Amino acid sequence: MKKKTSLSEEDQALFRQLMVGTRKIKQDTIVHRPLRKKITEVPTRRLIQEQADASHYFSDEFQPLLNTEGPVKYVREDVSHFELKKMRRGDYSPELFLDLHGLTQLQAKQELGALIAACRREHIFCACVMHGHGKHILKQQTPLWLAQHPHVMAFHQAPKEYGGDAALLVLIEVEEWQPPELP
């Protein structure tokens, strides 16, 4: 095995002789503070609050009037119907996907609220919600919930590449991003 030092015996002896009487320096100039847990808890708490706020709009008792013939679709009154046509043609490609398979109605509402909050926070305009076929509970409820939310501009049955009739493409109203003003 090769030794780690490349110094000769003389150099090592000289070094030891010069180091006689020295002691290790105690590091006392920099105080290391422990990491605070509050820093990581605040964003988590804020995210949970955003989800709760966003899912507040979803009611099982209110039934918005949606067209029951043809593919599932909805457009808010102040939004052009041309947006539905663009969604149907596949002009929009979703940046976020939400899979509701296996969730309860309560969990699905919370996840929908979280999706809408995340889209607004990240300035994402189009998302895909996959409700699946299943027992048709989430398939029937998801459009009713989405139509109640004020930040949902429109939704349409997804094109085949995004899930077809087991998914919805959703357009979310996002605030325009403004760069910070310089002083």
From Swiss-Prot:
Keywords: Endonuclease, Hydrolase, Nuclease, RNA-binding, rRNA-binding. It holds the Pfam family Smr. SMART domains: SMR. The gene is smrB. Residues 98-173 form the Smr domain. SUPFAM superfamilies: SMR domain-like. Gene3D superfamilies: 3.30.1370.110. It is an enzyme of class 3 (hydrolase). Associates with collided ribosomes, but not with correctly translating polysomes. Acts as a ribosome collision sensor. Detects stalled/collided disomes (pairs of ribosomes where the leading ribosome is stalled and a second ribosome has collided with it) and endonucleolytically cleaves mRNA at the 5' boundary of the stalled ribosome. Stalled/collided disomes form a new interface (primarily via the 30S subunits) that binds SmrB. Cleaved mRNA becomes available for tmRNA ligation, leading to ribosomal subunit dissociation and rescue of stalled ribosomes. GO terms for biological process: rescue of stalled ribosome. Its EC number is 3.1.-.-. This is Ribosome rescue factor SmrB. One of its GO terms (molecular function) is RNA endonuclease activity. InterPro entries: Smr_dom, Smr_dom_sf, SmrB-like. Belongs to the SmrB family. It comes from Salmonella typhimurium (strain LT2 / SGSC1412 / ATCC 700720).
